Design a protein with these regions (language model features):
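Catalytic pocket-lining loop regions of alpha/beta-barrel enzymes
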Residues: 1-102
Length: 102
């Protein structure tokens, strides 16, 4: 997972070199095969989830706090999910900031 400490040297090097890291979503989606009529629709719906998941790993593990100049780019995942995700993150923050997890 991207929150693994084994990625720390990559985050540090990219930040030091002022080099954006690109995440292209969709590579981890299982192959549903062409025999299933909804295969393409299932793939298209899951593409943005994989981008979100990568971003969540970095956000919640503190990567962006440890590397404030790290540049992260999500490509080919659309942006329709961004407003709803930001709203959810704000809600989670409000609920968790005074808990033992905050």
């Amino acid at each position: 997972p991207l929150y693994s400490a084994s990625y720390q040297p990559i985050w540090a090097a990219a930040e030091a070199c002022d080099m954006p890291l690109n995440h292209h979503s969709g590579g981890a989606t299982p192959n549903f095969g062409s025999h299933f009529p909804a295969s393409l629709a299932m793939f298209m719906l899951e593409v943005s989830w994989w981008s979100q998941r990568a971003l969540w790993h970095l956000m919640f593990s503190g990567v962006f706090e440890r590397h404030p100049d790290l540049q992260w780019v999500n490509t080919e995942s659309g942006t329709a999910w961004v407003p709803d995700t930001l709203e959810k993150l704000d809600s989670f923050y409000e609920r968790m900031k005074y808990s033992k997890y905050g």
